[in-house]
């Protein structure tokens, strides 16, 4: 499949993309390959979703407009689901706090409890940050 990809054949389905990823990871020992392919597929599909949906641009725009939507003393809490989002929120809150726009911001990220993660496995990567205007 990797050879076909190099020859310019298109990747039309998620299965095609998975096969390309599997081919690229052939060098990994068989015992570790299944997990490596799974993780690589997750990251690849996440990156495609982020790009297709312009998620960083939308989040950046939201963070720029957020102070205008809050009254004095108003509070905002934002849940992020991966490090790229969290980095944007953290930097925005920190910079606007230093500029005097926010009176307080979270200095530590709030993470779900082990109990919540056991009930909802998708909560595992979630982080929450807050700011007060």
Question: Which residue ranges define each predicted feature?
Answer:
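S-adenosyl-L-methionine-dependent methyltransferase catalytic core, i.e., the SAM/SAH-binding region
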Residues: 1-133
């Amino acid at each position: 499949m990797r050879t076909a990809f190099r020859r310019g054949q298109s990747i039309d389905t998620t299965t095609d993309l998975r096969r390309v990823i599997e081919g690229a990871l052939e060098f990994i020992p068989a015992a570790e390959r299944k997990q490596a392919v799974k993780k690589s597929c997750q990251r690849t599909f996440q990156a495609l979703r982020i790009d297709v949906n312009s998620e960083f641009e939308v989040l950046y725009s939201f963070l720029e407009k957020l102070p205008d939507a809050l009254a004095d003393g108003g509070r905002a809490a934002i849940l992020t689901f991966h490090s790229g989002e969290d980095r944007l929120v953290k930097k925005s809150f920190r910079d606007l706090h230093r500029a005097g726009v926010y009176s307080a911001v979270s200095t530590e990220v709030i993470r779900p409890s082990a109990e919540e993660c056991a009930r909802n496995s998708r909560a595992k990567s979630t982080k929450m940050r807050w700011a007060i205007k």
